[in-house]
């Protein structure tokens, strides 16, 4: 399985009021959340089963400004792990590995 989508977090998003006033950047947790939700939707549309997720690794490589258009891509490593990457204009923003399994 592999996929891709575009992301953007508008300047009016409430998270920017505190992260950081006067110099807003997209929090890493928002990037992770977007990756997890996109992959979960793809898994559910293919298998039809809800899954649990574990963030096995994540690296935040470059800050993201409000309104910036990002490209999220992911692919299945064949071992139950999903590798993802998020890119902005001319640079890699974040990378990581997500593990998915059946709910307990």
Q: Language-model features: where?
A:
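Hydrophobic beta-strand-centered segment that forms part of the acyl-chain substrate-binding groove
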Residues: 36-73
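HotDog/MaoC-like acyl-thioester-processing domains
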Residues: 1, 65-66, 75-104
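A broadly conserved detector of short glycine/acidic/proline-rich loop/turn motifs that flank catalytic sites
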Residues: 9-13, 64, 76
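A generic structural signal for short beta-strands and their flanking turns/coil linkers
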Residues: 3, 16, 49-56, 68-70, ...
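Catalytic strand-loop segment that frames the active site of acyl-thioester-processing enzymes
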Residues: 1-26, 44
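Residue-level signal for inorganic ion chemistry
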Residues: 28, 74
């Amino acid at each position: 399985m592999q996929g891709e989508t575009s992301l953007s977090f508008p300047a009016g998003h409430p998270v920017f009021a505190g992260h950081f006033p006067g110099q807003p950047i997209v929090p890493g947790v928002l990037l992770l959340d977007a990756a997890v939700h996109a992959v979960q939707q793809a898994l559910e549309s293919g298998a039809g089963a809800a899954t649990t997720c574990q963030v096995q690794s994540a690296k935040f490589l470059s800050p993201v400004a409000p309104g910036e258009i990002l490209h999220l891509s992911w692919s299945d490593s064949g071992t139950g792990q999903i590798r993802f990457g998020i890119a902005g204009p001319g640079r890699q923003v974040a990378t990581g590995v997500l593990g998915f399994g059946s709910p307990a």
